[in-house]
Design a protein with these regions (language model features):
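Conserved RecA-like P-loop NTPase ATPase core
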Residues: 20, 83, 111, 147
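N-terminal amphipathic/basic-hydrophobic helices that include classical n-h-c signal peptides
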Residues: 1-16
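Structured adenosyl-cofactor binding patch, chiefly the S-adenosyl-L-methionine
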Residues: 120-165
Length: 165
């Protein structure tokens, strides 16, 4: 099955795009590693960092940030596969991720520090998938780095490059 997948993805890979939407103040501890993977995926990766909304009312922050995400997803990514990274999501192996991406442009959402109204997101985008890196809590920069490394790993699987063992 892997050979069939490689053949199928390799021919489509030159057109495949990934976008990562992240609500976060800073990834300063991960800048170097993020830059390295951005360089490796430069034709295929767009990262958009959205500034978190500052307010003591966390429910209001969640509501506003979710509204902003929905607007951006409709405006820029209406026809893309959408994946929300959230602890209640489903975990996948790298090989499963490479199959799920299925040669379709994909946007990933890393929500803000207080969470996201996933019910509102799923109402706006019923086909949105929910993925998880497990039940642990990660800093946004590390979650973004982990995601981008996995995307790079998938591309090496599709192109036959030696990276994933």
């Amino acid at each position: 099955m892997t050979c069939i997948l490689l053949d199928r993805f390799y021919s489509h890979f030159k057109f495949l795009m990934f976008s990562v939407l992240s609500i976060s103040d800073s990834d300063k501890h991960f800048t170097s590693a993020l830059a390295e993977y951005q360089k490796r995926l430069w034709k295929h990766l767009k990262i958009e960092d959205l500034k978190p909304i500052k307010d003591d009312n966390h429910q209001l922050v969640i509501q506003k940030e979710t509204k902003n995400l929905i607007e951006m997803l409709w405006k820029k990514y209406a026809n893309w596969q959408k994946i929300l990274l959230i602890k209640e999501g489903k975990s996948f192996s790298t090989l499963e991720i490479s199959e799920v991406l299925n040669a379709k442009d994909t946007v990933f959402v890393i929500w803000g520090p207080y969470g996201v109204d996933d019910k509102a997101l799923l109402e706006a985008f019923p086909d949105m998938k929910k993925w998880s890196f497990g039940a642990i809590t990660l800093p946004h920069g590390l979650a973004k780095l982990t995601l981008i490394e996995q995307l790079y790993r998938c591309t090496t699987l599709w192109t036959g490059k030696k990276y994933h063992y």
